[in-house]
Amino acid sequence: MGKDTIADIITSIRNADMNKKGTVRIASTNITENIVKILLREGFIENVRKHQEGNKYFLVSTLRHRKTRKRIHRTILKRISRPGLRIYSDYQQIPKILGGIGIVILSTYPRYNDRS
């Protein structure tokens, strides 16, 4: 059974929010780097840097705080499709999140990509 790195990212960010931590340390893989880039671009994360300990790489992410309170800016993170329950959807059925102000991160299977 493999590790679920996407669930690890979401859980780390949620736990940091509950404990009012400012930074999150995530194991660095191609998928985690791509997801963290999206979260950075969309404003969930304020800053990211790559850190090395021995032969392992980590992403150290600084979470965005609100100006008035010391709480994380946005904390509603959910994983819909997971290894035990895959969700497949037509492009017309992708839901709007939080009335259109949230984001959906999705991946496409390379075989179904229109550039192949």
From Swiss-Prot:
This protein's record includes keyword Hydrolase: no
Gene3D superfamilies: 3.30.1370.30, 3.30.1490.10
An annotated GO BP: translation
Pfam families linked: Ribosomal_S8
GO cellular component, one term: chloroplast
InterPro entries cross-referenced by the UniProt entry: Ribosomal_uS8 (IPR000630), Ribosomal_uS8_sf (IPR035987)
GO molecular function annotation: rRNA binding; structural constituent of ribosome
Location of this chain's protein in the cell: Plastid, Chloroplast
Origin: domain of life: Eukaryota
Record keywords: Chloroplast, Plastid, Ribonucleoprotein, Ribosomal protein, RNA-binding, rRNA-binding
Keyword Ribosomal protein: yes
Job description of the protein: One of the primary rRNA binding proteins, it binds directly to 16S rRNA central domain where it helps coordinate assembly of the platform of the 30S subunit.
Subunit annotation: Part of the 30S ribosomal subunit.
Family of this protein: Belongs to the universal ribosomal protein uS8 family.
Protein name: Small ribosomal subunit protein uS8c
